[in-house]
Amino acid sequence: MFFGEFEYKLDEKGRFPLPPAIRPSLKDGLILAPGTGEKCIYAYPLCEWKKLAESLKSTTVAPSKMRRLNRALFALAFDVNLDAQGRLTLPAPLKTYAGVNIEVIVAGVNNYLEIWDKETWESEKKASQEQAWQIIETLEEH
């Protein structure tokens, strides 16, 4: 499980370290994909990515919509590994997609991580915090 918010600056090669506490969860690999509907990068441990892929196979969404979703997730995904110092290099297409400049935020989101440009994250975090109580109330009603 991933949680917390971590702030980093990209080095001259576009790398940043991931928190040491989460690195063991990523030892088998990491899949980076564009956030769906959000200007961020999803970072899934390989085992979680495989679970996501399997769950999508059994969904009852219309085939044309499923093809679009698969293209959005899988065609633009990258299989990456951390270097010996625990650093991650963001692929240029994903870096551009998410508008990542120098300052990045890594946010733990349960079974995956999200990588955001710091400025974009601040706006998203505020919106999420403002809506969280409404979502919780809806969950409590069911």
UniProtKB/Swiss-Prot annotation:
Q: Which domain of life is it from?
A: Bacteria
Which is a Gene Ontology cellular component entry for this protein?
cytoplasm
Keyword line: Cytoplasm, DNA-binding, Repeat, Transcription, Transcription regulation
**Major localisation:** cytoplasm
Q: Which GO terms describe its biological process?
A: negative regulation of DNA-templated transcription initiation
Tell me the SUPFAM superfamilies matching this sequence. Answer: AbrB/MazE/MraZ-like
- Which compartments does it reside in? Cytoplasm, Nucleoid
Supply one GO molecular-function term.
Answer: DNA-binding transcription factor activity
Residue span, SpoVT-AbrB domain: 5-48, 77-120
User: PANTHER family given for it?
Assistant: TRANSCRIPTIONAL REGULATOR MRAZ (PTHR34701:SF1)
NCBIfam families assigned: division/cell wall cluster transcriptional repressor MraZ (TIGR00242)
Partners and quaternary state? Forms oligomers.
The protein, known as: Transcriptional regulator MraZ
Q: Which organism is it from?
A: Dehalococcoides mccartyi (strain ATCC BAA-2100 / JCM 16839 / KCTC 5957 / BAV1)
